[in-house]
Curated annotation (Swiss-Prot):
Residues 1-21 form the signal peptide. Disulfide bonds join C48-C70, C55-C74, C60-C81. Expressed by the venom duct. It is found in: Secreted. This is Turripeptide IX-04. The cysteine framework is IX (C-C-C-C-C-C). It comes from the Eukaryota. GO terms for cellular component: extracellular region. It comes from Gemmula speciosa (Splendid gem-turris). Keywords: Disulfide bond, Neurotoxin, Secreted, Signal, Toxin.
Length: 82
């Protein structure tokens, strides 16, 4: 059992040592973000705090008092802040 643990650790360390990290300059990073490759982190917009406050207020949580203002702020939160 100990032999297999040692073998697993040795293989993991060997595989980690073979990974080469190359630096990416800002131009390449921008091109990757525009092309959609990889995971993009969406920017958090300035209006998110206000829109979230409007969307999560009590009148927007109640189906009877939910209005167009609630819908607009909640749609903004879903599209731009989450």
């Amino acid at each position: 059992m100990g032999f297999y643990m040692l073998l697993t650790v040795a293989l993991l360390l060997t595989s980690l040592m073979n990974v080469e990290a190359t630096p990416v300059d800002q131009a390449e990073r921008s091109a990757l973000e525009k092309s959609g490759l990889g995971n993009r982190i969406q920017p958090r917009y300035d209006n998110c705090g206000d829109a979230e406050a409007d969307c999560y207020q009590s009148k927007c949580m109640d189906g009877e008092t939910y209005d167009e203002e609630c819908e607009a702020s909640c749609n903004y939160v879903v599209a731009n802040c989450i």
